[in-house]
Amino acid sequence: MAEKTYPMTLEEKEKLEKELEELKLVRRPEVVERIKIARSYGDLSENSEYEAAKDEQAFVEGQISSLETKIRYAEIVNSDAVAQDEVAIGKTVTIQEIGEDEEEVYIIVGSAGADAFVGKVSNESPIGQALIGKKTGDTATIETPVGSYDVKILKVEKTA
């Protein structure tokens, strides 16, 4: 079975590579040192510092494994390969819900780069799925767990 690919911009991949480097070169050694110190306290069966450090080690190793997989199977998307006014990964899109005045701006990213707090939505999210492939002036229906709503695409531009 083929591995899942992770569509992303080159910038997203570089960010993941930096995060992986930080985990391997800084966080992993810090956790190993904490485990070593906790071991020196003696009896491991009732050593909460040791248990906490081992839990953190498992978390860090899980993050490393996840990032390595995403980087290994990264599919770099070139937003220049699609029409200038077409929504794709790496594009910034301004939308307006039909019947509302407020405009919303989103950056479409691969799942690895999603961060809703700063307006970066994944191509796999309901918003991303509804907008990908649409063009300026089109309308799209965004399906959410609590219902659907229609939006008009006001502007599509390459993300700076």
From Swiss-Prot:
One of its GO terms (biological process) is DNA-templated transcription elongation. Pfam families: GreA_GreB, GreA_GreB_N. The keyword Lipid metabolism does not apply. It comes from the Bacteria. InterPro entries: GreA/GreB_C_sf, TF_GreA/GreB_CS, Tscrpt_elong_fac_GreA, Tscrpt_elong_fac_GreA/B, Tscrpt_elong_fac_GreA/B_C, Tscrpt_elong_fac_GreA/B_fam, Tscrpt_elong_fac_GreA/B_N, Tscrpt_elong_fac_GreA/B_N_sf. One of its GO terms (molecular function) is DNA binding. Keywords: Coiled coil, DNA-binding, Transcription, Transcription regulation. Residues 1-72 form a coiled coil. HAMAP family: GreA_GreB. Necessary for efficient RNA polymerase transcription elongation past template-encoded arresting sites. The arresting sites in DNA have the property of trapping a certain fraction of elongating RNA polymerases that pass through, resulting in locked ternary complexes. Cleavage of the nascent transcript by cleavage factors such as GreA or GreB allows the resumption of elongation from the new 3'terminus. GreA releases sequences of 2 to 3 nucleotides. Belongs to the GreA/GreB family. NCBIfam families: greA, PRK00226.1-1, PRK00226.1-4. This is Transcription elongation factor GreA. The gene is greA.
